[in-house]
Each structure stands twice: as C-alpha cells, then as structure tokens.
Amino acid sequence: MASLLCLFFSLLGLAAIGAVKNCHPQCRCEVETFGLFDSFSLTKVDCSRIGPGNTPVPIPLDTSHLDLSLNSTTSISDTMLSGPGYTTLVSLDLSSNLIAQISPKAFSKLRYLETLDLSSNALEGLSDGCFTGLPLVELDLSENQFKEFNLDLFTTRTQDLPIMVDLSRNLLTSIFRRTPGHPLYIKSLMLAGNQLKTVPKLNGIPLQYLNLDGNLISSIDTGAFDSLTELVHLSLSGLSELTLIHPGAFRSLKNLQALDLSNNSQLKTLNPNVFSGLVSLQELNLSNTAVTPLSRTVFMQMPNIKSITLGPNVHCWKTHMQGQFHRQIGQAKPNDILTCDNAGLIL
C-alpha cells in the first residue's frame, strides 16, 4: 500500500513538472485545470521583477494571465507581445514599470485580452488604434502622466462588452471626444485625483459609474450631467475648490441611485432644487460638508431616498410609517419619516 502511495505522488509530481516545463526559469507558473477529468488547462505566469533585459520572455502556449510588472520596462514594441503563448492571453499586467511609449500595434495579436493593467508608468499619450479589435472589459491607466485624453481611442475596440476605464491620479486637465456620433460603450470611468476644473462633456457614453473625486472643480452648472442619463453612481467627493452647485445640476439623472458629495469643505449651502430630478436616488453622502441642517423640501426632490450620511456619527434613514386605522375615516395616510441617529433628530 505504501509503495502504491509513493508511486501515486511521484506521478503527481511528474505531472506538475510536465505542466510547467516551458516556464521561464526566472518566472513562476501556475497551472489551472478545468473540465471533465481536468481535460483543459490554462497557465498563470508571473514574470514580475525579472528585469528589463529578459523581455520579451517565452511563455507556455496555454498562458491566460501574464504578470510583467516591476521590470523597469521603458517601451512596448510591436513584437514584444507577439510570440507563442501571447495570443491566448486574457489578462496582462504591465504596471509599475517605466513605460513611456507603446507602439501602435503592440497589442494587435492579443485578440482574447480582456484585462490590461498599465498603471504606474510614464505614459503621456497613446496612439490611435492601439486597442483595435481587443475585447477589453477592464483597462487601468491610473498613475501615469496624461494631461489630456481622447476617449475615441476606445471606438475601435470590440464593442460587444462594456469597458471599465481607470484614469485616476494622472495630470488630466481635459478629457474629450472628437467624434461623439460613434458608439462608445464605457460602463465605468474613474477620473479621481486629476486637475479637471469643470465637469467633462461625455456625450454619447452610456456611463453607469463616474468618479470625479479630488479634482479642481469649483462649480457645477445646471445640466452639467444632462448627457449621462444612465448614471447609477456618481462620486464628487473631496473637491477642495467646490463652492457652488447650481439648481438642476443633476436634473437628468433619473436613474442615479448613489450620490457622494462628501468632504467638500467649501460647500456651504445647497438649494433644494439642486436635487431635482433625482427620483431614483437611494443613498446620499454629505459628510464633512457645511450644508447641514438641510431643508425639509430637499427630501421632497428625492422620493426614494433611503439613507443620508451627514457626518461621521450622523446617519439618517427613512422609515415607512403605516397609518393607523380609524373606524370613522378608515385607513390613515402612511408617512415616510427620515430619522437621524444624532440625539434622535428627525428631519
């Protein structure tokens, strides 16, 4: 029995070695098997920290995830990602390098690529068509050196699936489209920590999530979000210059469910009509602002509000109070009461 167990574990060891026999000696490879009797396998390859002199690196033919981060790579050529094994990539991590230039066809062979991480590099621009034909669903361009960005770069990618784009913590003063008539399916756009002074015009983009935290926006005009009628979550936190939100700024956001206006210390007052049109809003964060107490008429603009945060220790919630039944007048009209956990305050 003992000999059989030894043979069994020996065979397992040989199988594991065989599964990663094409793994580069400086990389770490992990095989994942799927299907009946593990008939299908994919390999995750970690080639981070191997140094710039070792790229491009040969990888197993069934590689699905490749990590090339932290290699001090300065550029991506047309041939660097075109060797055997690269065409099956689903996920590619090029973060935390020194990449300042990417050739126009650098990703052209990666026809299955869904996730691309280019964060923490030195990129200032990207060539038109660099994402042509890619089925990307997630792209991280955060912590680079972009000063302006043309979203039309994404019109040439495969449009079947929505994409999440992270451009946070760059140097952006402008984000725009030159051809708003072309379809552009971006689901989530992260623009936090940039230098935008106004709400960007994002016409023709069916965004559901938008983050503008930590920009230099000083005022938000009436109708600033009129083109973003499908927004579900909007974050406008930490706008150190924000002093004014005009009435009707959110008037077209009938699908918005969560609005974050926290940490805007210069925002002193809010006209009740600022919240007009927010008929689906359920969560509102006003913590660390100076706009409390709020007028009762504010809540009339938000019939579906469920939760309001007014400070670190002040959280409000709406309770539906069923009216009592009276023999003479029948069922009394129910009331919605907003209760705050600050000394039992009721607004």
UniProtKB/Swiss-Prot annotation:
Q: Where in the cell is it found?
A: Secreted
Q: Which SMART domains match?
A: LRR_TYP
Under the heading Pfam families, the entry gives: LRR_8
Q: Where are the LRR repeats?
A: 62-83, 88-109, 112-133, 135-156, 160-175, 185-205, 206-227, 230-252, 255-277, 280-301
Which residues, renumbered to this chain, are glycosylated? N285
Signal peptide (residue range): 1-19
Origin superkingdom: Eukaryota
One GO BP: energy homeostasis
Q: What else is known?
A: This factor is named 'Tsukushi' because its expression pattern in chick embryos is similar to the shape of the Japanese horsetail plant, tsukushi.
Q: What does this protein do?
A: Contributes to various developmental events through its interactions with multiple signaling pathways. Dorsalizing factor which functions as an inhibitor of bone morphogenetic proteins during gastrulation.
Please state what the protein is called: Tsukushi
Q: Native species of this protein?
A: Danio rerio
Name the encoding gene, please. Answer: tsku
